[in-house]
């Protein structure tokens, strides 16, 4: 009872509601919230602490950045938060202005990321070669996927199409989705050069692809999640695309604190731990079936590969639909 009372009391404040509405769109740092809300940093920090004390949000430290996000796990509090968000006025001018500024913040990030990827595309294949044993990672991905053959593969955030090449001999058809035209230009050239006529790439938002549900028996997210504002959204989209007995392979860096990955490589997130991935998979109706770690060179963070599959209840729903 006391916890419910504290939650309701904390939610009964307009500025904290603004923060909650923004965090419902994804994780944000204090500096980003300050920029969006036009409030002082001490005030924003105070509101965040109140929301954290009430069990509504949690903070995640990565390197020198600290992200705030809505906390999951307590069903009662989550229900109160969901109800509160659902009852917020949809056309409130203050909330609408906040969302516009949120899009501005994301657009700034996107411009910087696009410039980075344009440079990567012009020098294709060099990113991370000195840090990560790509051959070992690709070999493990093939091993975890199994021999197939797969009817339809979808690679979300395909970049230069490397994952499509890796699985080209095991798929009947393949599609790669990416927003960056420079990367897709390289991908098309490489696929054509290798006569992979059964594989295509197209421009699109990996969080909301133009593809039908339940198409793929193999979906990959290779070194993609660390660039995203909302990694869970990509996993939800991957689940939508999966057949009832399909598999999702996620490859990304293990959680680390090397801030230069943000400045040098435009990473939004500094890797992930098993708990993060497991929670996101579970929320999307998937189960974490296997985890492998690939050791990297020198002091650089290791790469992990997570295999997700539709949970039993999710398989049943997909089969009926």
Protein language model features and the residues they cover:
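A short glycine-rich, Lys/Arg-flanked "PGG" loop and its adjoining helix->strand segment in the class I
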Residues: 232-247
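Conserved alpha-helix/loop element of class I SAM-dependent methyltransferases that forms part
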Residues: 132-151
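N-terminal helix-turn-helix DNA-binding core of bacterial DNA-binding proteins
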Residues: 2-43, 66-73, 142
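A short acidic, Gly/Pro-enriched loop at the edge of an enzyme's catalytic core
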Residues: 207-219
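A short SAM/SAH-binding and catalytic strip from SAM-dependent methyltransferases
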Residues: 217-230
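C-terminal alpha-helical "lid/dimerization" subdomain adjacent to the S-adenosyl-L-methionine
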Residues: 247-302, 306-307
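Amphipathic alpha-helical dimerization/coiled-coil segments
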Residues: 76-125
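Class I SAM-dependent methyltransferase SAM/SAH-binding core
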Residues: 152-154, 160-208
């Amino acid at each position: 009872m006391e916890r419910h009372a504290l939650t309701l009391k904390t939610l009964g404040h307009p500025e904290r509601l603004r923060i909650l509405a923004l965090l419902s769109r994804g994780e944000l740092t204090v500096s980003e919230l300050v920029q969006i809300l036009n409030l002082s940093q001490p005030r924003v920090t105070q509101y965040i602490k109140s929301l954290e004390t009430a069990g509504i949000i949690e903070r995640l430290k990565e390197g020198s950045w600290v992200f705030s996000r809505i906390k999951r796990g307590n069903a009662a509090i989550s229900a109160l938060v969901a109800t509160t968000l659902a009852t917020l006025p949809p056309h409130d001018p203050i909330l609408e202005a906040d969302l516009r500024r949120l899009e501005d913040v994301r657009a700034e990030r996107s411009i910087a990321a696009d410039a980075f990827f344009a440079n990567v595309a012009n020098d294709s294949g060099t990113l991370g070669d000195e840090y990560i044993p790509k051959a070992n990672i690709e070999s493990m991905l093939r091993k975890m996927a199994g021999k197939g053959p797969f009817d339809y593969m979808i690679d979300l955030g395909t970049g230069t199409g490397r994952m499509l090449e890796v699985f080209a001999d095991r798929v009947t058809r393949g599609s790669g989705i990416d927003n960056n035209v420079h990367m897709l230009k390289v991908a098309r050239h490489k696929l054509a050069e290798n006569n992979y006529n059964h594989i295509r790439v197209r421009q699109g938002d990996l969080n909301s692809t133009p593809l039908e549900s339940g198409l793929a028996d193999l979906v990959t997210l290779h070194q993609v999640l660390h660039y995203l504002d909302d990694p869970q959204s990509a996993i939800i989209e991957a689940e939508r695309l999966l057949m009832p007995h399909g598999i999702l392979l996620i490859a990304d860096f293990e959680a680390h604190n090397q801030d230069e990955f943000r400045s040098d490589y435009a990473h939004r997130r500094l890797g992930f731990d098993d708990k993060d991935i497991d929670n996101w998979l579970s929320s999307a109706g998937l189960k974490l079936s296997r985890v492998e770690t690939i050791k990297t060179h020198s002091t650089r963070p290791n790469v992990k590969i997570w295999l997700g599959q539709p949970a039993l209840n999710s398989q049943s729903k997909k089969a009926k639909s």
